[in-house]
């Protein structure tokens, strides 16, 4: 079954994005927002990748389930994803946890976040449901996963990829046979089983699932009636289907979208401060691992109206310049020097400041004569004159959130405490 021969299966699919998680390993970066709403890549939010994959794959019915501190996420979705047309059989629904099933029941798990909205799914009558995690960064054609699901007659198809075995404790780990039928599935095991012939690698779930809608609804009703269930796909639904049905693995390499500039399949959890910093800073390389300039697979997002970036002053020691950096619209670099730095919308960096290896979120303001190295600066933070970060590890650890690898997360409450 291939595109151009038959109608794309994506036309008959609905994408359901789970976007309610906090992402606590990002520490204070998610104090005010859910992980899917965290900024990424200069102008996007993390959730834009899953949504753009769905749109670029041809899926035109999308729902997003939200829960933890959802205001900024909902505002972003309303502003940036409001172009769907019902008269063209398109839809975009935002589904906050709202006690729709019981007066004392929020979303109890990932499966429950779908179960509580079964009536909305049924109202659109899709043949397939593509369940997505809204907190990963990657480019993927879900049409190819749908094709494998149909061709193999699966009850559920699970997106998977190889990771280092040492990292697999954070994921669902599976073992498959020669036809990619899943034989076992363990959610976040303390001792992940290795892949055959690859003792240091494990095959893990990406948190992406394809179901026939009818089968999924039956499974959700069965799970909801089980008082011993945690109502979670990875812990309950998928292991049950592995034992009692047919669960098939879909390898990410088969559907990863790569431009001519991308040599390997790119997928990032970006779930820790270190991983988040590294994934963003990688974009400043000459040839980054993730190509955001791929016009054939754009990452859609809310396009805030801003003037172009501006660089001013041209004297020794006070020259507005940026080398190997990404500078978004509305930024003003006033006599400051940037190296391997990513600035989101509306950032201002004032004279005599030196910034290197920095991820600076929207509308932060870096005052004069600062030296910042290997930092993540939260949105709207006001960095005071002369602040130095990245040169004294002990001082940094007392004042900011410093990781073991030396990355400092800076938020406004941390800055406010400097004067106390």
UniProtKB/Swiss-Prot annotation:
Task: Report the catalytic activity.
Answer: alpha-D-glucose 1-phosphate + ATP + H(+) = ADP-alpha-D-glucose + diphosphate
Q: Does the keyword Transferase apply?
A: yes
Q: Which SUPFAM superfamilies match?
A: Nucleotide-diphospho-sugar transferases, Trimeric LpxA-like enzymes
Q: What's one Pfam family the UniProt record gives for this protein?
A: Hexapep_GlmU
| Pathway(s) this gene product operates in, as recorded in its UniProt entry | Glycan biosynthesis; glycogen biosynthesis
Q: Which domain of life is it from?
A: Bacteria
Which segments does the entry list as coiled coil?
A: none
Q: What does this protein do?
A: Involved in the biosynthesis of ADP-glucose, a building block required for the elongation reactions to produce glycogen. Catalyzes the reaction between ATP and alpha-D-glucose 1-phosphate (G1P) to produce pyrophosphate and ADP-Glc.
Q: Which PANTHER family match?
A: GLUCOSE-1-PHOSPHATE ADENYLYLTRANSFERASE (PTHR43523:SF2), GLUCOSE-1-PHOSPHATE ADENYLYLTRANSFERASE-RELATED (PTHR43523)
Q: What is this protein called?
A: Glucose-1-phosphate adenylyltransferase
What is the native source organism of this protein?
Rhodopseudomonas palustris (strain HaA2)
- GN (gene name): glgC
């Amino acid at each position: 079954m291939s595109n151009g021969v038959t109608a794309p299966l994506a036309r008959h699919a609905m994408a359901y994005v789970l976007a309610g998680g906090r992402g606590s390993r990002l520490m204070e970066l998610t104090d005010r927002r859910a992980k899917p709403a965290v900024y990424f890549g200069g102008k996007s939010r993390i959730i834009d990748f899953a949504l753009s994959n769905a749109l670029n794959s041809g899926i035109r019915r999308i729902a997003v389930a939200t829960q933890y501190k959802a205001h900024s996420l909902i505002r972003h979705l309303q502003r940036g994803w409001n172009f769907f047309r019902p008269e063209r059989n398109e839809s975009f629904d935002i589904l906050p946890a709202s006690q729709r099933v019981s007066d004392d029941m929020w979303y109890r798990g990932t499966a429950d976040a779908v179960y509580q909205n079964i009536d909305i799914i049924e109202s659109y009558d899709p043949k397939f449901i593509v369940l997505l995690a809204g907190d990963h960064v990657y480019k993927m054609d879900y049409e190819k996963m749908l094709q494998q699901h149909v061709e193999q007659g699966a009850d559920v198809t699970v997106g998977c990829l190889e990771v280092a075995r040492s990292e697999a404790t954070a994921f669902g780990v599976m073992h498959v046979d020669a036809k990619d039928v899943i034989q076992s599935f363990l959610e976040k095991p303390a001792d992940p089983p290795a892949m055959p012939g690859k003792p240091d690698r494990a095959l893990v779930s990406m948190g992406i699932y394809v179901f026939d809608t009818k089968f999924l609804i039956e499974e959700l009703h069965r799970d909801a009636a089980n008082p011993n269930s945690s109502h979670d796909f990875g812990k309950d639904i998928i292991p049950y289907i592995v034992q009692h049905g047919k669960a098939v693995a879909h390898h990410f390499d088969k559907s990863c979208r790569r431009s001519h500039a991308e040599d390997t399949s790119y997928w990032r959890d970006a779930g820790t401060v270190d991983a988040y910093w590294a994934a963003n800073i990688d974009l400043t390389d000459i040839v980054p691992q993730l190509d955001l300039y791929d016009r054939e697979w754009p990452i859609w997002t809310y396009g805030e109206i801003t003037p172009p970036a501006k660089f001013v002053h041209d004297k020794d020691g006070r020259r507005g310049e940026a080398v190997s950096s990404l500078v978004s619209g509305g930024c003003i670099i006033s006599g400051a020097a940037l190296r391997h730095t990513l600035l989101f919308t509306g950032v201002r960096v004032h004279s005599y400041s030196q910034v290197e290896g920095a991820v600076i979120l929207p509308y932060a303001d870096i005052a004069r004569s600062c030296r910042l190295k290997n930092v993540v600066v939260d949105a709207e933070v006001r960095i005071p004159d002369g602040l130095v970060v990245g040169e004294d590890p002990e001082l940094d650890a007392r004042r900011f959130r410093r990781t073991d690898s030396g990355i400092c997360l800076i938020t406004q409450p941390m800055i406010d405490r400097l004067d106390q």
